[in-house]
From Swiss-Prot:
GO terms for cellular component: nucleus; transcription regulator complex. It comes from Mus musculus. InterPro entries: bHLH_dom, HES_HEY, HLH_DNA-bd_sf, Orange_dom. The gene is Helt. Transcriptional repressor which binds preferentially to the canonical E box sequence 5'-CACGCG-3'. Required for the development of GABAergic neurons. This is Hairy and enhancer of split-related protein HELT.
């Protein structure tokens, strides 16, 4: 009798564990799909995608890949462009953090805590700078920032900020996301802006075929224009 009671108690627990593992596997796979399918990756900037949306985009993308006139090999270029977005965003976040540390927290470059934070961010940036795809004639990202005092190029900014800004750039120099105005800045963020290069200078050599790929893929899945899925052509200078 006691053995039967023990068996009954074990069964619900085992079922819950199995069910949890199954849900975890499903969620893990859906997260991977969201990072793999280009259109799902592009839409994640506007908020979290529903599971059904990710599955629908995956089906549409696979259909487009298997269509006879899909331009083979271009998907790598599309994913490389998304990698560019990531590197640029990481660089922008690093600049804002340094601006916060030096203006709000009043840290100096000689502070141990400041140096440790910056060294950690730089180490992660170098790891992320490794090319994921074959070279596409793009300038190599340079994350080798050095701790140094502020130079005349950065009037009005603290010494720590000069460590993060490329030549001629200041905090908040570049709009993000590309093609859209920056959201209202936090009190510690500068609103200074600099002119962006002309469109011909902004576009990397492979953007022309990329635009054709976007239009072809979106036409196949029933969207007439790339902006229908919030997929904007990058309007920012190359990652420095």
């Amino acid at each position: 009798m006691s053995d039967r009671l023990k068996e009954r108690k074990r069964t619900p627990v085992s079922h819950k564990v199995i069910e949890k593992r199954r849900r975890d596997r499903i969620n893990r796979c859906l997260n991977e799909l969201g990072k793999t399918v280009p259109m799902a990756l592009a839409k994640q900037s506007s908020g979290k995608l529903e599971k059904a949306e990710i599955l629908e985009m995956t089906v549409q993308y696979l259909r487009a890949l298997h269509s006879a006139d899909f331009p083979r090999g271009r998907e790598k270029e599309l994913l490389a462009e998304f990698a560019n977005y990531f590197h640029y965003g990481y660089h922008e976040c690093m600049k804002n953090l340094v601006h916060y540390l030096t203006t709000v927290e009043r840290m100096e470059t000689k502070d141990t805590k400041y140096a440790r934070i910056l060294a950690f961010l730089q180490s992660k940036a170098r790891l992320g700078a490794e090319p994921t795809f074959p070279p596409l004639s793009l300038p190599e990202p340079d994350f080798s920032y050095q701790l140094h005092a502020a130079s005349p190029e950065f009037p009005g900014h603290s010494p720590g900020e000069a460590t993060m800004f490329p030549q001629g750039a200041t905090p908040g120099s570049f709009p993000w996301p590309p093609g859209a105005a920056r959201s209202p800045a936090l009190p510690y963020l500068s609103s200074a802006t600099v002119p962006l290069p002309s469109p011909a200078q902004q576009h990397s050599p492979f953007l022309a075929p990329m635009q054709g790929l976007d239009r072809h893929y979106l036409n196949l899945i029933g969207h007439g224009h790339p902006n229908g899925l919030n997929l904007h052509t990058p309007q920012h200078p190359p990652v420095l």
